[in-house]
């Protein structure tokens, strides 16, 4: 059942067993977490702007009010230096729900679960950007402005990508220096 791991020159070990619902993409075992973070943010950049666009087309007035509440909660927690990561994930997951695409809802929950693995890489760096872009995303969805929603989500994920890219590049420079 793939529970043993043989390490050359070291022996055989029982693998770290994590329920698949906590790691549905089985990414916990990927050793290069920084590259994994880049891969995940690139996937988000491909998917989430289109999801926000669908949400702008399909969100009901009631859903828009709830989305505004989620946006306000994230903003409040950021401004009061409270843990907001789960609320941020709830915000993105709810946008997927507003898209009215059942496949998107499932995919985004899997991606957001994976994002939890590396969220500490960026969340302290992007507090103000998160507030500004979440507001823009919410406003565009509330106004049923699909182009605005797509653009705002692209900006939001791009900020995340830039922060992760800085870490990725710094790590690669460090590895190059170690090889010399």
Where are these regions (language model features)?
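Residue-level detection of the helix-turn-helix DNA-binding "recognition helix"
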Residues: 165
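A glycine-/small-polar-enriched, mobile loop at the entrance of the PLP active site in fold-type I
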Residues: 123
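Short linear motifs at protein or domain termini
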Residues: 1-45, 53, 174, 180
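Conserved amphipathic alpha-helical segments that form helical-bundle/coiled-coil interaction surfaces
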Residues: 40-120, 129-138, 148-162
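Short, charged, intrinsically disordered terminal tails
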Residues: 168-176
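Short beta-strand-centered segments that line the small-molecule binding cleft or hinge
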Residues: 126
């Amino acid at each position: 059942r793939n529970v043993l791991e043989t390490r050359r020159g070291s022996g055989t070990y029982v693998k770290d067993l994590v329920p698949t619902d906590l790691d549905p993409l089985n990414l916990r075992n990927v050793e290069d977490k920084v590259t994994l973070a880049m891969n995940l943010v690139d996937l988000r950049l491909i998917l989430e702007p289109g999801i926000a666009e669908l949400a702008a087309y399909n969100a009901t007035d009631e859903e828009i009010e709830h989305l505004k509440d989620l946006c306000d909660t994230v903003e409040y927690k950021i401004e009061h230096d409270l843990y907001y990561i789960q609320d941020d994930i709830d915000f993105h997951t709810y946008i997927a729900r507003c898209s009215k695409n059942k496949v998107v809802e499932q995919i985004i929950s899997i991606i957001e679960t994976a994002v939890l693995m590396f969220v500490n890489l960026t969340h302290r760096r992007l507090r103000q950007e998160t507030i500004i872009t979440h507001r823009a995303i919410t406003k565009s969805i509330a106004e049923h402005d699909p182009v605005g929603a797509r653009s705002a989500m692209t900006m939001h994920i791009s900020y995340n990508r830039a922060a992760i890219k800085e870490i990725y590049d710094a790590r690669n420079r460090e590895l190059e220096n170690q090889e010399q």
